[in-house]
Amino acid sequence: MLFDIYRKTFEADNDAFWWGGETHYRSWDDGTMYLYLFIVFISFLAAWWCDKRRFVTNASRCGSKYKISRCFLIIHMILLLFMGLRGSWVGIDTIVYSQTFENATSLSAVFNDDSTTEPLYKIFMFILRTIFFSRHVAIFIFSALIMYFVFKTLKKYYNSLCLAVAIPAFVCIYYFHSFNLIRITLAASFLLWSTPLLVNEKYKQYSIRILVTTFMHYSSIVLFLPLGL
């Protein structure tokens, strides 16, 4: 029943995509939905196990810290591998990022493409294109940065969070969206990682990070609002 609703929505919005001289159509696959449900389930299971490690006696606290770090690493790597190793057609915008990477052969090519894309993103793509020759590597690096910032924040506030809720919530609400909305998810994860600066009233440093992130995605500028309040 639920899959039928998803399928109808998917088919209604399944427009053609042109890239590389070819027209492509996305195809529905129940197996993909089962895979996504598996990711949600395994992230909940690992987060629950990590929460369980929290309730230990003082005598075994050192050992528990090691187990907690290992648990964080396991969850991190599972989510990173699925996100970073996805195909170019997983996520509508992934192919657009791939195309931007392929075309970023010089700064002039990057900045003369008649797009309104943020300058920091263009420079970052040019740097990646200079170092690497595969768009899949670029997508993996974007994914690795997103996951790093999110999990560094979760780990910092570990003692104040219920991971069995926090991690599955991240997966269901933001993780799958990041397969498509790469730039804004990277900007959001970086600013999430910067939240301690706001909490500790280090407004100048926080403002600098907002300003920098704004040149990755212009919507980041709204984060100046909490400073005004």
Q: What positions do the PLM features span?
A:
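Membrane-interface transmembrane helices that cradle and orient dolichyl/undecaprenyl
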Residues: 191-205
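Transmembrane-helix signature of polytopic, membrane-embedded enzymes
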Residues: 151-172
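Short hydrophobic/aromatic helix or loop-helix immediately within or flanking a transmembrane segment
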Residues: 95-103, 110-133
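Extracytoplasmic loop-helix module adjacent to an early transmembrane segment
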Residues: 63, 69, 74, 85-108
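Membrane-interface alpha helices of multi-pass inner-membrane proteins
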Residues: 174, 205-228
